[in-house]
Amino acid sequence: MAEIINQIPGYEKGRVQRINATDEVSESFIVAQMAADLRKKWNTSVLCISLDGHKEAIESLIPQEKAVGTVYVLDQKNPEFEVVLRKAEGIINRRFVRALIISGAERLTTRTFKEKPEKGREWIDHRLNGLSGGIGLPIILVEVHEESIEVQS
């Protein structure tokens, strides 16, 4: 799993990046490791938002070592994207948060954009680019992509 973290293209400020996980366990692990890594490298706080109810799993995987920043984990089950965005902006503005990691973002688009998932991804990227570009915040979306099996007839 550590190899996955090392392969992530740098944490670029002001940019939305997508990372694919193989299952929900690896998704939580990636979020926790990235949050701990960012907290240690930048000496700052990180906000993690779990859109699929994995708050406890993420919190248990974050190393409890002494660091300057704090990792905040927000749990949002079956949320509306606008509500999540508003809550994230509130926390970012009140605390010294300089990175945002969202797990389960693809679940938001599958409900709204069932027929056109690519359009949903573009919509989310557009909304998050506005948040990240204004204050130079890196936003990382961790998503689960199961391998689709094609049935030949």
What is each residue range found by the language model?
Residues 42-123:
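Conserved inter-motif catalytic segment of the P-loop NTP-binding fold
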Residues 14, 95, 135:
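Structured loop/turn residues at beta-strand edges in well-structured enzyme cores
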Residues 18, 99-103, 140:
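Structural motif
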Residues 11, 39-40, 92, 131-133:
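Conserved ATPase "switch" residues in P-loop NTPase domains
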Residues 35-36, 88-89, 125-129:
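Short amphipathic alpha-helical segments and helix-helix/interface helices
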Residues 1-66, 86:
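The Walker A/P-loop phosphate-binding site
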Residues 122, 126-153:
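Phosphate-binding/switch region of NTP-binding enzymes
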Residues 1-2, 94-97, 148-153:
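C-terminal regions of RecA-like/P-loop NTPase motor modules
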